[in-house]
């Protein structure tokens, strides 16, 4: 019929399907754009080179795990079994690693105070505003002296007053700055406690002594699930789970770090981190700012069939970590790669970053890109003020110019092999020499006689020697025991492992110490000498881990925390090497100093504030509640002001009242007046 039009009616399912098809098509078109393919291709090239360069390091790390677990390499097992005999493995490496871990944890974690501190930055010169304030204080001080003495101070006195005013002002500023630094320290300690610093650092120490390098990542802002408490309408306390954003820290598995080939430090080139993510973790990124929701949904639909990871290394690592049959777990995992490095501005603009963030398309920008398979799920700039990556790295022994260093398993690898060989030979020799070797003349043994079993009081049936020889039919030969020589070899090379690793046996409780170690003072000297080796490792931790991580957390607080009372210029001090000194000795010296200064002369010099500062350090060393034992500087100052006001008020109340006087200036009548008058005239009352 002419002029009629038809309206097509579709249901909600059809509309949803059409929208999904349109969204998938748009995503495919965007991901297939040359720039996106270029970004993925660039990352793939970087990844392939980094993965290839790390293969020797991966084999070294797998060997270190086997060495700690007491397992031979596959080729060594074949050689031993071809020869026959014992497959015993002496756990020298494991003992040294555990001793080193315990020693480092005792130095860095078990001191009652963090292995770092914050101090206010020294002020070399005053700003113009502060100089004006000093001049004003100086003028007031001079005016007061003129009013008191009726004359101006001499030029030398003026210069001395000016210097004193400047020093007092600088001291006041430093005290205020140190108060801010102390508040910042408390804030960072709380953030470390909430962000998992201690647990991460504990795992980091295990990596440090085992692998060629160890890593810590942070601060990384994540959503934290915490418990809160509130009072309901009935006055009862109820629990409430809340989500808050906060900085977190984590130990990064060295197997999952892939640096750019040829670099020495993390900041020298790009870096990949491998994130195995379950479907739930990946889906939780939907809606998070910076992530591409459509790309994530597409990856979830496709699955993890486009992984770039070498599964052989993953399987071997899982077996060494006792994660048997991990490949059979029903939970699907996606291999996400986090890239930190330079990316061209053109790629970032085409991805979706604004021109305000990327003003020049021709420049290279520090970026953070996440890729799963062939899909980029995140591409943002690195917003660190210095463009640094959120990683820190160090090694047990560092090699100049190399990214990867050495761990204890690598250091004593040869010595572990010799100890194993000596132990295998010892066990084999003990087995052979434990009984006699039996020689039997079969021509003189009856056919039904069992010659494979020996027992006490066994009777052997034999025949005469056909040739008339007088030699016995059965002869016993006792093999020699070489246990003494083999034990000497083992002990020699195990002692060499002490020297090479820097972890002597007496550090972890071996009482069989010869020479100077037999006395307490001699053992103390040996412990001090052994500490020189571990001190170098502690210095690496101080400079490469503790100081940069604390500094990054400080910068984060300066940028994002709203509390202005904690903000100020500070210097981060790492104290791990200082903590290596004997803590008891340091505290004893502090107590001796307190006793030596407990006299009026020294108290006038150091004052109550100085003595309180020493008491605080002594209380910290004794792991006492410092704030409950010694008042803080603020509280002590407040108490001093209150006491001063109370003393002034008491003196004012005790001051004698003015005596009433007559017009001629004499006291008014009465007994007291007469007494005063008589005293004035010199006569007795």
Question: What is each residue range found by the language model?
Answer:
Residues 199-207, 225-226, 435-441, 505-520, ...:
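Short, glycine/acidic-rich hinge or "gate" loops at secondary-structure transitions
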Residues 326-328, 337-517:
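Extended, charged amphipathic alpha-helical segments
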Residues 178, 182, 198, 406-409, ...:
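Conserved structured core elements
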Residues 661-685:
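Long, low-complexity, intrinsically disordered segments
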Residues 187, 191-194, 219, 415-429, ...:
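Generic, well-ordered alpha-helical scaffold segments in large soluble proteins
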Residues 1-366, 485, 491-492, 681-685:
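Extended, helix-rich architectural segments
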């Amino acid at each position: 019929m002419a002029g009629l039009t038809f309206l097509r009616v579709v249901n909600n399912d059809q509309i949803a399907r059409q929208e999904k098809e349109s969204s998938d098509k748009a995503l495919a078109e965007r991901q297939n754009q040359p720039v996106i393919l270029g970004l993925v291709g660039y990352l793939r090239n970087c990844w392939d080179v980094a993965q290839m360069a790390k293969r020797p390091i991966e084999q070294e790390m797998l060997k270190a795990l086997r060495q700690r677990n007491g397992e031979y390499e596959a080729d060594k097992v074949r050689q031993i079994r071809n020869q026959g005999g014992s497959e015993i493995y002496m756990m020298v490496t494991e003992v040294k690693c555990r001793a080193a871990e315990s020693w480092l944890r005792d130095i860095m974690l078990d001191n009652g105070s963090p292995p770092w501190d914050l101090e206010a930055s020294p002020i070399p010169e005053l700003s113009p505003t502060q100089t004006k304030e000093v001049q004003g204080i100086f003028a007031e001080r001079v005016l007061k002296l003129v009013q008191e003495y009726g004359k101006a101070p001499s030029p030398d006195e003026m210069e001395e007053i000016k210097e004193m005013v400047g020093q007092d002002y600088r001291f006041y500023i430093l005290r205020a700055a140190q108060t801010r630094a102390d508040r910042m320290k408390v804030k960072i300690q709380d953030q470390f406690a909430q962000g998992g610093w201690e647990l991460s650092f504990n795992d980091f120490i295990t990596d440090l002594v085992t692998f060629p390098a160890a890593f810590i990542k942070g601060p990384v802002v994540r959503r934290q699930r915490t418990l809160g408490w509130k009072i309901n309408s009935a006055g009862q306390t109820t629990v409430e789970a809340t989500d808050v954003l906060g900085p977190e820290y984590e130990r990064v598995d060295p197997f999952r770090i892939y640096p750019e080939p040829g670099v020495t430090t993390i900041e020298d080139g790009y870096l990949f981190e491998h994130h195995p993510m379950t479907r739930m973790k990946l889906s939780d990124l939907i809606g998070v700012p910076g992530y591409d929701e459509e790309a994530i949904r597409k990856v979830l639909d496709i699955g993890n069939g486009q992984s770039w990871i070498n599964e052989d290394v993953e399987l071997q690592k899982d077996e060494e970590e006792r994660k048997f049959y991990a490949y059979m777990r029903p939970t699907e995992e996606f291999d996400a790669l986090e890239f930190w490095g330079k990316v061209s501005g053109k790629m970032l603009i085409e991805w979706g970053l604004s021109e305000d963030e990327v003003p020049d398309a021709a420049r290279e920008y520090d970026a953070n890109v996440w890729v799963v398979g062939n899909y980029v799920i995140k591409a943002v700039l690195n917003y660190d003020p210095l463009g640094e990556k959120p990683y820190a790295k160090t090694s047990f022994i560092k090699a100049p110019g190399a990214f990867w260093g050495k761990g204890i398993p690598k250091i004593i690898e040869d010595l572990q092999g010799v100890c194993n060989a000596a132990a295998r030979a010892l066990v084999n020799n003990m087995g052979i020499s434990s009984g006699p070797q039996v020689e039997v003349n079969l021509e003189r043994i009856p056919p039904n006689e069992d010659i494979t079993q020996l027992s006490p009081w066994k009777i052997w049936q034999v025949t005469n020697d056909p040739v008339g020889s007088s030699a016995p039919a059965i002869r016993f030969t006792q093999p020699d025991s070489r246990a003494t020589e083999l034990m000497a070899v083992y002990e020699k090379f195990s002692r060499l492992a002490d020297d090479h690793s820097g972890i002597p046996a007496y550090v972890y409780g071996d009482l069989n110490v010869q020479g100077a170690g037999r006395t307490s003072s001699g053992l103390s000297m040996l412990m001090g000498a052994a500490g020189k080796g571990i001190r170098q490792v502690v210095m690496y931790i101080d400079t490469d881990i503790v100081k940069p991580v604390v500094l990054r957390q400080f910068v984060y607080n300066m940028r994002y925390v709203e509390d202005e009372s904690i903000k100020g210029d500070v210097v981060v001090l790492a104290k791990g090497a200082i903590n290596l000194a004997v803590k008891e000795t340091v505290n004893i010296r502090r107590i001796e100093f307190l006793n030596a200064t407990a006299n009026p002369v020294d108290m006038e010099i150091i004052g109550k504030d100085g003595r309180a500062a020493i008491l605080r350090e002594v209380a910290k060393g004794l792991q006492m509640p410092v704030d409950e034992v010694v008042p803080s500087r603020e509280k002590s100052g407040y108490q001093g002001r209150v006491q001063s006001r109370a003393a002034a008020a008491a003196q004012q109340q005790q001051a004698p009242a003015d005596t009433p006087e007559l017009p001629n200036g004499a006291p008014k009548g009465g007994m007291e007046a007469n007494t005063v008058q008589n005293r004035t005239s010199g006569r007795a009352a």
